[in-house]
């Protein structure tokens, strides 16, 4: 039976569906009727559009393979995703490790990757920290704090939190000074190899606008810095740093094999390079990230490897096609 590729109509669905069509698959988008024209008229990448949050029976009848986006769990909920009957590209067990900051930290440390210090008690803050609420919300609610007093003032202002009992869904991380770098990887279970797909950095409001205001005016305005993501900027990394990034990806894949039965498909390590050229990672996104949308026509790194335009969305479709051709489809699905 013909396999079709499906995804929720959000985040990086345009790229995923375009890549699937480029590899000869029929495509399915599902979600809000409000966005239907985006996928069928303005950017006609969906052969089918189903106006439901999660149309399980229709997807099963269409022999769909669901490809998760970076906002998949945010829209559908982790319980629904873990229990869906439609074949899912990737390892669902990764979702718990990715969404739980303590498990995520355990994963990164097992991989031998430098991670920021974490404060369990805000009253112990003794250096600049960045405070992150639970869940992937594009940096919304993130804030900097320099000491306990500053933390509590901003926690109430941005998150409505006044008591320690309400802190269970936030993480207080050491703020590591450096250049933000977000390498995008793809691990092929068919080929058993890691690929560096592309690299980006985020464009965030208002932190990336602060520099346009003279320092004396910043002090007068008494502004609080926020980190809401509004877009992404491509990066070509210094060539001497590429092996650091690639080796970090290899170690994450190896640790995932031991902890949760493997990580395959696209993922991203979100971190910074310090002035000492140390790669410090503060988060992992174990699915396609929005930063790959810059590279719908491929990146410098995929061009070097494939000598043709290959986006992360297309690479997913290539993996599914190769799995079908090698009678390995069940091995890349859960």
From Swiss-Prot:
Keyword field contains Secreted: no
Note accompanying the cofactor annotation: Binds 1 Mg(2+) or Mn(2+) ion per subunit.
GO BP, sorted A to Z: 'de novo' IMP biosynthetic process
Task performed by this protein: Catalyzes the ATP- and formate-dependent formylation of 5-aminoimidazole-4-carboxamide-1-beta-d-ribofuranosyl 5'-monophosphate (AICAR) to 5-formaminoimidazole-4-carboxamide-1-beta-d-ribofuranosyl 5'-monophosphate (FAICAR) in the absence of folates.
Molecular function (Gene Ontology), one example: ligase activity, forming carbon-nitrogen bonds
Protein name: 5-formaminoimidazole-4-carboxamide-1-(beta)-D-ribofuranosyl 5'-monophosphate synthetase
Entry-linked Pfam families: DUF1246, DUF1297
Residues binding Mg(2+): 270, 283
Pathway the protein contributes to: Purine metabolism; IMP biosynthesis via de novo pathway; 5-formamido-1-(5-phospho-D-ribosyl)imidazole-4-carboxamide from 5-amino-1-(5-phospho-D-ribosyl)imidazole-4-carboxamide (formate route): step 1/1
Disulfide bond annotation, renumbered to this chain: none
Family: Belongs to the phosphohexose mutase family.
Native organism: Pyrococcus furiosus (strain ATCC 43587 / DSM 3638 / JCM 8422 / Vc1)
